[in-house]
Amino acid sequence: MKTLFIAPTRNGVGLTSTALGLLRALERQGLKVAFLKPIAQTHEAAPDDSVHWARTLAHAVTPDPILLSVAEEQLSQGQEEELMENVVALAREAAAGVTGGADVLVVEGLALNERNVYAGPLNASLARNLEADVVLVSSLAGVTPATLADELEIAAQAYRRSDGSGLAGYVLNFAPLELDFGGLLADLRARSRILASGELPLLGVIAQSPTLAAPRTLDVARHLGAEVLNEGEARLRRVTSTVVTARSVPKMADLFTSGALVVTPGDREDVVMAAALSHLSGVPLAGLLFTSGSTPEAAIERLCRAALTSTLPVLRVETNSYNTASRLSRMEARVPHDDLERMERTLDFIADRLDTVPLGTRLRAPEGSERRLPPSAFRYELIQKARAANKRIVLPEGDEPRTVRAAIRCVEKGIARCVLLAQPEKVRQVAEGQGLTLPDGLEIIDPDRVRANYVAPMVELRKHKGLTAPQAEAQLEDNVVLGTMMLALDEVDGLVSGAVHTTANTVRPALQLIKTAPGVRLVSSIFFMLMPEQVVVYGDAAINPNPNAEELADIAIQSADSARAFGIPPRIAMLSYSTGESGAGADVEKVRIATRLVRERRPDLPVDGPLQYDAASVLSVGRQKAPNSPVAGRATVFIFPDLNTGNTTYKAVQRAAGVVAVGPMLQGLRKPVNDLSRGALVDDIVYTIALTAIQATQAREGA
C-alpha cells in the first residue's frame, strides 16, 4: 500500500476539500482508497470536518483522529515517538477498513494557523513516519508568483527525503478565472529549482468558484445568530452577493438579482417593497435581512405579506447594517456538516481538475525492494508482534530501577509476561520509590528460594566439562546464570540482562548453557538504528572483536535475515575505509573476500563491498563512488569490519545525532538472550524485551 500525505504550504489553502477531492479522483482511477486524518484540527471532541466528510461522502471507514490537545500534551512532554506510534496504528486501522485492502492511503495533515505554530514540523514528521509521498496544497489567492515559488520551494525541501524522493506533486487552489496559466507556470519554474527539475509535478489548478463558495441562507442565519422570521427556502437558497442598502432603490434595483441577500433596516419601506416585488417577479433572492432589531410598519407588512410569508427567507439581527455587513465579510469558508450538496459539488469540481493518471500509475507500481521502514512503524510493529507472541521473559536484574519500570510497562501494555528475579520486598521498595504500582500480572521470583532446583540440571548440562554440584551452586548465585538455566529448561522463553552487568556476564552463560542454533558457527549481534527517515541495522557492534572473512560473511547473512524478519528489506553494505578497488591491504581484502562469500552463499541478498560509510548511506555519494552498485546509497544493513569500528560508530551516531539504538540483539543462539547497554533507558529495555519475545517465536518456528 502506498501513502499520500496532503500538506498545506500556509493557512487557508483549501486543505480538506483538496484531500477529499484527490481521494475521489483516485477512486475514479479504479484504486481502492483509504482516508486518515491522524490529528484533529481542534482541541474539542467535536467531529472533525475531514473525518465527517470522508465518512459521509466517501463512505470511508476511517478512525477518529487523535485530539489536538492530546497531541500537544505529548509533544510538550517529549513524547513525539509515542505520538507517531499511535498515528501508525491509526493508519493501519484506516487501511484495514477497505475491503480487500487499500491500494493507497490518503492522509490529511494539519492546517497551518497562528495557534499551532508547530504544525509544519509536525506534518513533516507525520509524512516521514508514515513513509508517505507528499502532495503540497497552495493557493493563488493574494500572493505573487515570487512568493508562491518560494513557498513551494521551502515546503518541498522540508518534505523531500535525503535521496530526493518523497514528493508526489502540488495543487494550486483559488486560481483567478482570467489566470495566464502558461505564464504562471513558466514564472514559477524560473524561480524554483525543484519545480524546474520536475521533482514536484503540478497535479492541478483549481479555479475560484463563487457558486461553490456560496453558503446557504440558513448558514448566514447561524453565523449571525439571526432570528428567523420566515424560513422559506433558507435551506436551499444560497448567498452569492450581499446588497447593503445605503442608496435609493432606483440606484440599487439592478443589484436585486438571483442569490442576493438584501441587508436593510426594517424602516426602509422602499427597500422592503422593492425586495418583495423582485421576489414576486420571480427573482430568487437569497433572503431579506432586517438590521437594528427592526421590522417594517404593519401597513407595509400587510402589503408585502405575499412575499414575506412565502419561499423568501426573512431574518432579523440586532446589529446595525454596517456591523452586520462586517460580520458577513468574516464568515468562515468551511462547509457545514449538513450541507451535503455543496460539499459533493466541491469534491466533484476538484476531482475533475486533478491530473491523477500519472499519479495513479505511480501508486499502482509494486513496492519493490526500495521500501523503507520508518522508526514509528518499526516500533509499532515490534510492540504488536510481541503482544501476539505473548512470551515469558526473565529479567535477572529484577530489582534494578529501570528494569522494574520497564517490566511494569511491558505487563501493563501486554508486551510480554515478565519475570523479575529478585527479593519481592526489594522490588516493592524500588517501585514505591518511583511512585509505581506493581501490576498483578508481574511475576517476581525470589532467587534464594529456587536456586537449589537448578543445581542438578546444570551439572547435567555441563558434565562434559566436569562441572560439580558445589561449582554449580556457586555459579547459580549469579542471577544471570540462574535465569539462563530457566531458559535452558524451557521455563521461560527469553532472557534480557545487562543494565548493570557487562556483555560478557550476559553472553557467557548463554554460550555455555543455551549454545548456538543448529548450523550456526558463531554468535553475533546487531543494533536497530532508528534514523529519522528509516530503521537500519548495524552489525556486529557488541560481540566479535576481529572476525575473519568467513565470520564476517556469517555476520552479514545473520544480520540480513534478522533485518528481513523485522520488516526491513535487506541491502547489505560491507564497510571499509575504501570503496571498490580504490584500497589495498589485509583489512580491505578481508571485506572483499567476505562480500564474495555472501554472494556465493546467499545470491538472493543484495550486497556490495568494500564500501565506505558515506558511499553506502548517501545516494549522491554512492552514485559517484560506486555507480554500478546495487546497494550504494541505499544500504539498510551495515556490516562493520571489526568490533572497534562498529561499537564506536553506533555510539557516535546514537549520541551525536540523537538516534535511538535498539539492542544489541544477539543472533545465532538456540534461544533468545539479549544484552543491554549499561546506559540503557527504560524505553530501550522495553523494546529489547519486545525483540526477545519476537525472537522466541521465530526460534520456535525454526525449531
UniProtKB/Swiss-Prot annotation:
This is Phosphate acetyltransferase. GO terms for molecular function: phosphate acetyltransferase activity. Involved in acetate metabolism. The N-terminal region seems to be important for proper quaternary structure. The C-terminal region contains the substrate-binding site. It is found in: Cytoplasm. The gene is pta. Residues 377-703 are annotated as: Phosphate acetyltransferase. In the N-terminal section; belongs to the CobB/CobQ family. It comes from the Bacteria. SUPFAM superfamilies: HprK N-terminal domain-like, Isocitrate/Isopropylmalate dehydrogenase-like, P-loop containing nucleoside triphosphate hydrolases. GO terms for cellular component: cytoplasm. Pathway: Metabolic intermediate biosynthesis; acetyl-CoA biosynthesis; acetyl-CoA from acetate: step 2/2. Its EC number is 2.3.1.8. CDD domains: DTBS. It catalyses: acetyl-CoA + phosphate = acetyl phosphate + CoA. The keyword Acyltransferase applies. Keywords: Acyltransferase, Cytoplasm, Transferase. It holds the Pfam family DRTGG. GO terms for biological process: acetyl-CoA biosynthetic process.
